[in-house]
Amino acid sequence: MSANCVSAAPTSPKNSDVEEIRKSATYHSSVWGNHFLSYTSDVTEITAAEKEQLEKLKEKVKNLLAQTPDESTGKMELIDAIQRLGVGYHFTTEIQESLRQIHEGQIRNDDDDVRVVALRFRLLRQGGYRAPCDVFEKFMDDGGNFKESLKKDVEGMLSLYEASYYGIDGEEIMDKALEFSSSHLESMLHNISTKTNKSLLRRLQEALDTPISKAAIRLGATKFISTYREDESHNEDILNFAKLDFNILQKMHQEEANYLTRWWEDLDLASKLDFARDRMVESYFWSLGVYFQPQYRTSRIYLTKIISIVAVIDDIYDVYGSFDDLRSFTDVIQSWKISNADELPPYMRICFEALLGIYEDMGDRIGAPYAIDTMKELVDTYMQEAEWCYTEYVPTVDEYMKVALVTGGYLMVATTFLTGINNITKKDFDWIRNRPRLLQVAEVLTRLMDDIAGHGTEKKTTAVSCYMKEYECSEMEASRELSKQVKKAWKDLNDEWMEPRSSSAEIIGCIVNMSRVLHIMYSTGDDGFSDSSTRTTQAVKTLLVDHPMN
């Protein structure tokens, strides 16, 4: 929303200058156009030979997992490789049982090796176990700092660095681990020869850019496959299994992108509503980041369609609609009746009809009513932000966040995705509808990431502008303080992930994974959804366009 506001209390809407500002936003056209129409059935067909080979390799990897003792460092390294290669979903039961054994045993024979201790800690916390952080105390000196001698161990530093991102609020030792390891790795980065240590240089850059805890699994796998291939101790069966699985899934995802492109072209919203963002492919990338596995196809389809339409609705409220039209649009969506749409301008009616069509496709799924309710709530808060804009009102940070956490769309997105999963129950939807702590934390995290990245690039009210106004500070000071809240939110997500969990791992994973994909879009300081011509485009290209792994 427009940030050209003053700190007066809300009054009646004004016309004139504010409306002109609201109509000034411009967005680049779709980077992809109809590119994915080229992925026809003959291109995306998965052959019988591929399926047979995948099953053979899967059995070999499964046997390897069974034969490697849980009491060994090799078992932890095996689990880590399988998960980072993106194929852990094939062995969920086996990995969970191994981690249970490791947790119960809390093996101590390698306690003097920081690499192994950090790896064990990370794997257990990734698996939901509250592994104690005091295992790192033996690596501290009398002054309470990590021993300088650890800096000689590059692999140990990398392992400690990755583990440090699984800390929770109040774990001072994990904060020290992050500061110690990251500063040393950054120093190493500037001193490594690009000629003699290309592999290590790339690993350091990738780790510092996106630690494992914040990485979307599928994107992380594309990078780790190359790293694993270069490891002299790699297992050829695991490597071949990961590459084949990636290629098969890529075909599935290309077919989905083809279907969605045809759906989007049939709607023709991009030409009918040319003031709005055309971001269908970026919306699919978002849904792919939540869950990429084959069984979540329906959820990805629902979510991609909804995000694509919501981007247009958001632009109607932010950019194009007059105040009176926005009020009418809000009322019609609250009624959820197509018969009431006759009073709307044509461009709003087109959008409303498209929105209704998606929810009609959900039929009698348990989550459909919940998904509709969250959409109504989202639009209602869009209207609240529009009123702020038209009355030139700058809310306090608390006022802003109460509304902005909803306009961020996190609950709507999560509910929509879960609607496509058959085994999600009414109890599950009631739980998430009540906004549990996990969801609140994720909403704060992504809202602030978006606002910090977007402040100054668009004429919008953000948490940064509200903080600057309320606390009379500079943009840098406001961003610094809000960034502290982002760091705490990541820790709180870790806390919610670990046992005892408030819901199933599948639902919690959905919410956490959404934060990871949004981290990709916003972590460079840019809005990677609205301006998708940079990092997001490369991510889409990596997952959906680049040639298969070989």
From Swiss-Prot:
SUPFAM superfamilies: Terpenoid cyclases/Protein prenyltransferases, Terpenoid synthases. The Asp-Asp-Xaa-Xaa-Asp/Glu (DDXXD/E) motif is important for the catalytic activity, presumably through binding to Mg(2+). The gene is SES. Mg(2+) 3 binds at residues 450, 458. This is Selinene synthase. One of its GO terms (molecular function) is terpene synthase activity. Sesquiterpene synthase that catalyzes the formation of alpha- and beta-selinene from trans,trans-farnesyl diphosphate (FPP). Also produces some nerolidol. One of its GO terms (biological process) is diterpenoid biosynthetic process. Transmembrane segments: none annotated. It holds the Pfam family Terpene_synth_C.
